[in-house]
UniProtKB/Swiss-Prot annotation:
GO biological process: base-excision repair
Cofactor dependence: Zn(2+)
Species per Swiss-Prot/TrEMBL record: Rhodopseudomonas palustris (strain BisB5)
Gene Ontology MF terms: 8-oxo-7,8-dihydroguanine DNA N-glycosylase activity; class I DNA-(apurinic or apyrimidinic site) endonuclease activity; damaged DNA binding; zinc ion binding
Domain of life: Bacteria
Annotated catalytic residues: P2 (schiff-base intermediate with dna), E3 (proton donor), K58 (proton donor), R283 (proton donor)
UniProt-listed Enzyme Commission number(s): 3.2.2.23, 4.2.99.18
Keywords from the named record: DNA damage, DNA repair, DNA-binding, Glycosidase, Hydrolase, Lyase, Metal-binding, Multifunctional enzyme, Zinc, Zinc-finger
Subunit structure: Monomer.
Entries under NCBIfam families matching the protein: fpg, PRK01103.1
One Pfam short name: H2TH
Protein name in UniProt: Formamidopyrimidine-DNA glycosylase
Lineage: Bacteria, Pseudomonadati, Pseudomonadota, Alphaproteobacteria, Hyphomicrobiales
Catalytic activity: Hydrolysis of DNA containing ring-opened 7-methylguanine residues, releasing 2,6-diamino-4-hydroxy-5-(N-methyl)formamidopyrimidine; 2'-deoxyribonucleotide-(2'-deoxyribose 5'-phosphate)-2'-deoxyribonucleotide-DNA = a 3'-end 2'-deoxyribonucleotide-(2,3-dehydro-2,3-deoxyribose 5'-phosphate)-DNA + a 5'-end 5'-phospho-2'-deoxyribonucleoside-DNA + H(+)
Function as written in the Swiss-Prot or TrEMBL entry: Involved in base excision repair of DNA damaged by oxidation or by mutagenic agents. Acts as a DNA glycosylase that recognizes and removes damaged bases. Has a preference for oxidized purines, such as 7,8-dihydro-8-oxoguanine (8-oxoG). Has AP (apurinic/apyrimidinic) lyase activity and introduces nicks in the DNA strand. Cleaves the DNA backbone by beta-delta elimination to generate a single-strand break at the site of the removed base with both 3'- and 5'-phosphates.
């Protein structure tokens, strides 16, 4: 499933085509996505200007002039592509054959910018939903989410307090969207490797007896910010289904130090160990026992 960097990459790709422009036409080719599209979905979008395009955790949020918000989630295999309204491709643009299969083009927006924005999702685990901006605090998909890891509210003090007393593993705590929003398996593995912290370590060790951040918390917050920033610059990680809006592959997977590198040499200078894999809470965890303590 796309994580924060992949979703942010999509947002950056959609912004020039959507933000500040009117949805001249909205088409739904099938309504049965992960959750059925609302009956008034097309009516509430047609003619509306997208005043802003943001992101919360792994969700895209398009603010509309009407006061509504269009929430979009990519699911497992969802992707957007942006083409000219007549379907022509920009010269030099690469489109993966999967995202070009029109049988999976479920939602299409023709924008006043001249762009056609197409949501393609073979597995149909993605979804879209419209709700009033005034009700955003009560929106079930957003309610209870922790702070954004790239936002000002996220720091070592906040993370230490959120993990104080938690006897769960550090990895499990970081995957809890109530602790920090938008992190997934890939970037948690990478951040823990950069911080030299074991995924098996208890989350409580990020705080001292006064619930103040330990050195572990300081290292980890820095590592989380760094790995997410690097991944966004690289356009995300393309392991299976993720594509940028241009159809191009992200390439951060070529920089993985831990994730999906089982048996390979650890990239920490002077370590000499090898990356290991084990199943933790139903997910593969990749780490180096030699330098992650």
């Amino acid at each position: 499933m796309p994580e924060l960097p992949e979703v942010e990459t999509v947002r950056l790709g959609l912004t020039p085509a959507m933000e500040g422009f009117r949805i001249a036409r909205a088409v739904t080719n099938r309504d049965d996505l992960r959750f059925p599209l609302q009956k008034d979905f097309v009516a509430r979008l047609t003619g509306q200007i997208v005043t802003g395009l943001g992101r919360r955790a792994k969700y895209l949020l398009a603010d509309l002039a009407s006061g509504d918000v269009l929430l979009m989630h990519l699911g497992m295999s969802g992707s957007f592509r942006v083409v000219a309204a007549d379907g022509a491709h920009t010269p030099g643009e690469f489109h993966h054959p999967r995202s070009e299969d029109r049988t999976h083009d479920h939602v299409v927006f023709d924008m006043s910018s001249g762009a056609r924005v197409i949501f393609n999702d073979p597995r149909r685990f993605g979804f879209m939903k419209i709700f009033p901006r005034a009700a955003i605090d009560d929106e079930p998909h957003l309610k209870g989410l922790g702070p954004e890891p790239l936002g000002n509210a996220f720091d070592a003090v906040m993370l230490a307090r959120a993990c104080a007393g938690k006897q769960t593993s550090l990895k499990a705590a970081l995957l809890d969207q109530r602790v920090v929003a938008g992190l997934g398996n890939i970037y948690v593995c990478e951040a823990l490797w950069r911080a030299h912290l074991s995924p098996k370590r208890k989350a409580a060790t990020l705080a001292n007896r006064k619930n103040e951040p330990t050195d572990h918390a300081l290292r980890l917050t820095d590592a989380i910010r760094a790995v997410l920033g690097d991944a966004i610059k690289a356009g995300g990680s393309s392991l299976r289904d993720h594509r940028q809006t241009s159809g191009e592959l992200g390439y951060f997977q070529h920089s993985f130090a831990a994730y999906d590198r089982e048996g390979e040499r650890c990239r920490t200078d002077g370590c000499g160990g090898a990356v290991k894999r084990f199943v933790q809470n139903g997910r593969s965890t990749f780490w180096c026992s030699g330098c992650q303590k």
